[in-house]
């Protein structure tokens, strides 16, 4: 049994992905079925596998923490793409062109004192 591991991050979410081969196509997130855990964001994590036209011969075990469901699903997608690149270096080109290996570094900006939010100032009155 071969195992490839990679980490993906997005906003506050961190996902540690392990892809095991050979497998039965099981995908677990925090020991829960991925479809049940991610609900509407489930299709997002399968995109790297669909791009490479890989069938369900792998088991994928994922540990996530932080962030919301969308951030976690994007972190999982990045982790899966990185693990697939470790598995076979020829996968790198199609995954890179599809944008699955790009780390989105946007994070929430902190609130500053004297302001209502990160950039929103209280209403200005001249008189």
From Swiss-Prot:
Pfam families per the UniProt record, alphabetical: Ribosomal_S9
Keyword Ribosomal protein: yes
InterPro entries xrefs: Ribosomal_Su5_D2-typ_SF, Ribosomal_uS9, Ribosomal_uS9_bac/plastid, Ribosomal_uS9_CS, Ribsml_uS5_D2-typ_fold_subgr
Entry GO terms, CC: chloroplast; small ribosomal subunit
Keyword Ribosomal protein: yes
Subcellular location: Plastid, Chloroplast
Primary site of residence: plastid
GO biological process: translation
Name the UniProt record assigns to this protein: Small ribosomal subunit protein uS9c
């Amino acid at each position: 049994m071969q195992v490839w591991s990679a980490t993906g991050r997005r906003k506050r979410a961190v996902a540690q992905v392990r892809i095991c081969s050979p497998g039965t196509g099981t995908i677990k997130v925090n020991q829960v079925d991925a479809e049940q855990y991610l609900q509407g964001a489930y299709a997002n994590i399968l995109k790297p596998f669909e791009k490479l036209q890989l069938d369900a011969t792998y088991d994928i075990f994922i540990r996530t923490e932080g962030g919301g469901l969308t951030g976690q699903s994007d972190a999982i997608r990045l982790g899966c793409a990185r693990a697939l690149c470790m598995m076979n270096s020829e996968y790198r080109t199609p995954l890179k062109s599809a944008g699955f290996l790009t780390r989105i570094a946007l994070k929430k900006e902190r609130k500053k004192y004297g302001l209502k939010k990160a950039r929103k100032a209280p209403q200005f009155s001249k008189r």
